[in-house]
């Protein structure tokens, strides 16, 4: 099975008490992120202190695989694991989580930043992020939590411009980040979602097929 399937199986078999403990650690981390004024940097150029990373890498890492959950974007057929950190190896296989941002577990005063490559020959990852529109949904599964986000803002910024990635008081945001334009990659495409109620049926919608729209 896929990486996502093995994560699903592992999470499904976990004891509720352990899930609660793991989630509490992540919430605590998110509280620290909110209170700290760490300047976020371009996710494609992250350098963190090793000591902090050890602590960070242990949180939400249920089977030592460094996968914290998975991201589904039905309208562009994405279903990919979310890994700790944004190292080169991580970004070749899936979605990276920017360590200085909130863990993607939802809650007020959180803003998780998830990063993926565009134009990798080996995998599509975030190549189709440019197809997303305001009002589209994406979903994050972490252990037994299912979170839904509705795209409310799409911006293109310079790599060092991270103000759109900051936490907004009282809000629950996730921003998906990739390099743009295709082949040049000198800007960052930011697709931000705001938390909304989760409905399983929205996760089942089929991908938009651009080619057959008019047939």
Residue ranges of model-derived segments:
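Solvent-exposed, non-transmembrane regions of membrane-associated and secreted proteins
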Residues: 1-133, 137-215
């Amino acid at each position: 099975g896929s990486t996502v399937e093995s994560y699903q199986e592992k999470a499904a078999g976990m004891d509720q008490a352990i899930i609660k403990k793991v989630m509490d650690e992540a919430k605590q981390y998110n509280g620290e992120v909110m209170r700290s004024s760490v300047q976020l940097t371009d996710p494609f150029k992250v350098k963190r202190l090793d000591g902090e990373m050890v602590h960070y890498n242990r949180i939400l890492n249920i089977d030592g695989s460094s996968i914290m959950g998975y991201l589904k974007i039905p309208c562009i057929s994405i279903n990919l694991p979310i890994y700790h950190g944004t190292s080169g190896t991580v970004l070749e296989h899936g979605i990276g989580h920017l360590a200085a941002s909130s863990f993607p577990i939802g809650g007020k005063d959180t803003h998780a930043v998830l990063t993926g490559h565009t134009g990798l020959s080996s995998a599509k990852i975030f190549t189709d992020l440019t197809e997303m529109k305001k009002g589209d949904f994406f979903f994050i599964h972490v252990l037994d939590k299912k979170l839904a986000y509705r795209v409310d803002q799409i911006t293109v910024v310079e790599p060092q411009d991270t103000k759109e990635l900051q936490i907004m008081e009282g809000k629950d945001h996730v921003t998906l980040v990739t390099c743009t334009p295709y082949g040049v990659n000198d800007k960052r495409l930011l697709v931000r979602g705001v938390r909304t109620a989760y409905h399983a049926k929205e996760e089942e919608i089929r991908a938009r097929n651009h080619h057959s729209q008019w047939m």
